[in-house]
Amino acid sequence: MTGEDFKIKSGLAQMLKGGVIMDVVTPEQAKIAEKSGACAVMALESIPADMRKSGKVCRMSDPKMIKDIMNSVSIPVMAKVRIGHFVEAQIIEALEVDYIDESEVLTPADWTHHIEKDKFKVPFVCGAKDLGEALRRINEGAAMIRTKGEAGTGDVSEAVKHIRRITEEIKACQQLKSEDDIAKVAEEMRVPVSLLKDVLEKGKLPVVNFAAGGVATPADAALLMQLGCDGVFVGSGIFKSSNPVRLATAVVEATTHFDNPSKLLEVSSDLGELMGGVSIESISHASNGVRLSEIGW
């Protein structure tokens, strides 16, 4: 997290505030997302729900596929790279995407190091499930944070847990009385004292913080906005439903009018069959289940 480059990159991410970012796997889906009012799309070859089932190593998408989506819409396009895989990031940056997501949804390439994002011109998005994780990613140069949630499940509870935890930890740290106490917490979080102080003074992260992971309905999106998120990522929920066009528009409307119950009632009606999903509690380590939110450090 350094100087003017970071200000520019975090400023670009600020432009997405209040919006919805949708996962898409084809140019046709990207066009649906754009028409529905999405502020950006995430181009990837498989949505998280399908990645969960495959059991395969998940890598960055084919650059040609990403380029085809970039050529199909006028809104910003994001693409995912594996945690720690700075060469995938170099390739995606050369493709001139608008944002890169260093994502726990893909199979990590490095189990001890995240990408040094300050070395790139393109803004990075990273997931976090608590304040320390968010600040470590920001210190590496992330211009945007999202809750990890539990991607591909349609179960919003992990995303709710993560945004509540970050908010509560900021409030708790604001109660610290001495410089020594603040320094101790910063050391425990493995971040500079100056970064933690900046958060405590502002009462929020220095970058936008979107909700992600398990968002499947307009009500889910509005819930996370009311809990303090700056916007919403929607992955598997849209195109695993029976009426993606209607649902995509409804989620955008709910994100915009998140504090208007009458509008939320209107956009939540007659949506067709929603994503079936998988409950968080059914993903057990005993049965070799993998919780994607636990990937990262």
Curated annotation (Swiss-Prot):
Keywords of this entry: Lyase, Pyridoxal phosphate, Schiff base
A GO MF label: pyridoxal 5'-phosphate synthase (glutamine hydrolysing) activity
Catalytic site: 80 (schiff-base intermediate with d-ribose 5-phosphate)
Cited CDD domains: pdxS
Residues at which D-glyceraldehyde 3-phosphate binds: 164
Phenotypic consequence of gene deletion: Defects cause some sensibility to 6-azauracil, an inhibitor of purine and pyrimidine biosynthetic enzymes, and methylene blue, a producer of singlet oxygen. These effects are probably due to the inability to synthesize pyridoxal 5'-phosphate.
Residues binding D-ribose 5-phosphate, per UniProt: 23, 152, 214, 235-236
Any GO BP: amino acid metabolic process
E.C. numbers: 4.3.3.6
Keyword Ligase applies: no
Pathway: Cofactor biosynthesis; pyridoxal 5'-phosphate biosynthesis
Record's catalysed reaction(s): aldehydo-D-ribose 5-phosphate + D-glyceraldehyde 3-phosphate + L-glutamine = pyridoxal 5'-phosphate + L-glutamate + phosphate + 3 H2O + H(+)
Annotated GO CC locations: glutaminase complex
Superkingdom of the organism of origin: Eukaryota
HAMAP family membership: PdxS
Oligomeric and partner information: Homohexamer. Interacts with AIM18.
Functional description taken from the UniProt entry: Catalyzes the formation of pyridoxal 5'-phosphate from ribose 5-phosphate (RBP), glyceraldehyde 3-phosphate (G3P) and ammonia. The ammonia is provided by a SNO isoform. Can also use ribulose 5-phosphate and dihydroxyacetone phosphate as substrates, resulting from enzyme-catalyzed isomerization of RBP and G3P, respectively.
UniProt family annotation: Belongs to the PdxS/SNZ family.
Protein name: Pyridoxal 5'-phosphate synthase subunit SNZ1
Organism: Saccharomyces cerevisiae (strain ATCC 204508 / S288c) (Baker's yeast)
Lineage, top ranks: Eukaryota, Fungi, Dikarya, Ascomycota, Saccharomycotina
Underlying gene: SNZ1
